[in-house]
Amino acid sequence: MTKVELAKLRTVIPEMRRVRRIHFIGIGGAGMGGIAEVLANEGYQVTGSDLARNAVTERLESLGAHIFVGHSAEHVNEASVVVVSTAIKQDNPELLAARELRIPVVRRAEMLAELMRFRHGIAIAGTHGKTTTTSLVASIYAEADRDPTFVIGGLLNSAGTNARLGSSRYLIAEADESDASFLHLQPMVSIVTNIEADHMDTYGGDFSKLKATFIDFLHNLPFYGLAVVCVDDPVIRGMLPEIARPTITYGLSDDADVQVLDFVQTSNRSRFRVRRKDAGELEVTLNLPGIHNALNAAAAIAVATEDGIGDDAIIRALAKFEGVGRRFQQYGEFETGRGKAMLVDDYGHHPSEVKVTINAARAGWPEKRLVMVFQPHRYTRTRDLYEDFADVLSKVDVLVMLEVYAAGEEPIPGADGRALCRSIRSRGSLEPIFVATPDDVPAVLAGLVGEGDLVLTQGAGNVGALARRLGEMKLSIESMKSGA
């Protein structure tokens, strides 16, 4: 799309014509950066700040955004509006300055809601699978020449970005329940993949409040909108009588409106049938492993079918889907000095996400020894789901445990990496290896990993950078000892 074509798209939100400069505090995150990219391409002057540059900020700078490293009150001067991420603390100098200057301050989801207000919004929520499902929906719509705008929480590999401004009325976006801010969204179609206990501090530790918030999210749909929900999830199944909107269910269950059948996985590819009520069956090849991804694809198929997208476009999009960054992302093989090992990186940081990732690895490569490098994410999550983590992590062959990635939290006694190691060790099936930092992992792996192993780096913190490093290194005990 040329700059002239992009400039014409600014008329998409004429009601925001008084807005000149939009400033993002914490612009380097995938969610914030994605919205900033769409707005920059619409022609708005975008500025932002973060503690360090990264791939997101570099891409935004290439689009003309001005990025500040560090936070300072003067950065918000002359801003029309300030957008803040949930990670920003109340004493941030830019946030304080914006309030003193009476500049409107909105959360990320509020700005996303404004982008969606004048479009046909498709919002994807759920504890797990949001990013992949959003990416699958966006890929199908792109394959069908619907040219959607999308904002995704991870890098869509085929597009090389996590956000794109399209020329059509469609906006496909990931909806974040972590701070309940997804209630700002008013889409035409909403998907809910599953509901489990996570981010419980937001909901006062009350799971019933979390469920009620998801129902409120679905009721933000107009009466003529569409809810697409996974009936396999017991919480969602129990909520069905309370959802007062047109609803399509999907899943493995016989009573699903869109049912996945005959799932078979071979390495990284999956094949299955999809039975659709009133629309016939599809034979699907999905370029992703794991039955959980077949369910994500079923949600995307349900939305696309309901919107009149042809079967050929659906089948093509799923077969050539290139995946999402840090979602079972394969880095090929790397040398260990004891042979070649397969390297995979995954963002999953909830016990259920870790479980399905392990299952996908076992199903696709059953002959390989599974070596996991796991980094817990947040002390509160580790505390709340402690036994679940210990159970699922006991299922790998070799476990290298990192310390908890705090994400701004204070340590909680008994909810750290060493404690998890002790609990796993007490189960008697595995002897975990504790490593304090990702920088120390290569030396440990040099003495552990051998020919034919599958090394899986797992977690939402900085363990993702470790996978990229390993892919570029030739590990050997000698090189690690010499500091090479």
Swiss-Prot record:
Compartments reported by the entry: Cytoplasm
Binding site for ATP: G126, T127, H128, G129, K130, T131, T132
Keyword field contains Protease: no
Protein name: UDP-N-acetylmuramate--L-alanine ligase
Reactions that this protein is recorded to catalyse: UDP-N-acetyl-alpha-D-muramate + L-alanine + ATP = UDP-N-acetyl-alpha-D-muramoyl-L-alanine + ADP + phosphate + H(+)
One BP term from GO: peptidoglycan biosynthetic process
E.C. numbers: 6.3.2.8
Annotated metabolic or biological route of this protein: Cell wall biogenesis; peptidoglycan biosynthesis
Task performed by this protein: Cell wall formation.
UniProt organism field: Aeromonas hydrophila subsp. hydrophila (strain ATCC 7966 / DSM 30187 / BCRC 13018 / CCUG 14551 / JCM 1027 / KCTC 2358 / NCIMB 9240 / NCTC 8049)
Major enzyme class: ligase
Keyword Ribosomal protein recorded: no
Annotated Gene Ontology cellular component terms: cytoplasm
The family this protein is said to belong to: Belongs to the MurCDEF family.
Annotated InterPro entries: Mur-like_cat_sf, Mur_ligase_C, Mur_ligase_C_dom_sf, Mur_ligase_cen, Mur_ligase_N, MurCDEF_pg_biosynth, UDP-N-AcMur_Ala_ligase_MurC
MF (Gene Ontology): ATP binding; UDP-N-acetylmuramate-L-alanine ligase activity
Keywords, comma-separated and alphabetical: ATP-binding, Cell cycle, Cell division, Cell shape, Cell wall biogenesis/degradation, Cytoplasm, Ligase, Nucleotide-binding, Peptidoglycan synthesis
Gene3D superfamilies xref list: Mur ligase, C-terminal domain, Mur-like, catalytic domain, NAD(P)-binding Rossmann-like Domain
SUPFAM superfamilies: MurCD N-terminal domain (SSF51984), MurD-like peptide ligases, catalytic domain (SSF53623), MurD-like peptide ligases, peptide-binding domain (SSF53244)
